[in-house]
Amino acid sequence: MATRAESEVRVTILFGILQQLMTTRQNKLFANLSITSSQFGLLMHFTHNPIRSWLVSELAKVMEMNQPGITKVVTQLVDKGLLLATPDTSDGRKKHLKITDKGLKTCSKTMNFFEPDIQNIYSSFANDELSELEQRLEKLMTWLDTNRDDIKGL
């Protein structure tokens, strides 16, 4: 039987492998679309609360990207009409960003495109196994989100 430390290392290795396998799958799927995985990831962030506007600096923080990187993706999405950029009334350098109806539809169409592969990935899981996996991943996601700066060894 593995020790807790051995299990923690193994789970971390498995997450690395899963991340690579899922990234490869996503890249193959996105090759057929007019939007990139980075654009989709950012656009999906807006779908959680479509009426909220965001500043680039806020997005950079929550998406854990540098400001030039997020600005590039935002510009691409604005150019495609998927985000709307409205200048700040007190500081014209700042732009308030909101998802457009076209952006919401693009997210929905993209998720529909992914649905067959998503179902394929989890087809070998019983409903209770999938529910348990979801609960455990939610717990891990919440911990990682809450403890973004609590990195031991730095």
Question: Where are each of the predicted segments found?
Answer:
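C-terminal regulatory/oligomerization modules of transcriptional regulators
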Residues: M1-T3, N127-L154
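Short, hydrophobic-biased segments on the C-terminal half of alpha helices
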Residues: V56, V74-T75
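N-terminal helix-turn-helix DNA-binding core of bacterial DNA-binding proteins
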Residues: R25-N66
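N-terminal leader segment of winged-helix/HTH proteins
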Residues: M1-L33, K80
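Recognition helices and adjacent regulatory flanks at domain boundaries
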Residues: M1-A2, E8-V9, Q19-L21, E58, ...
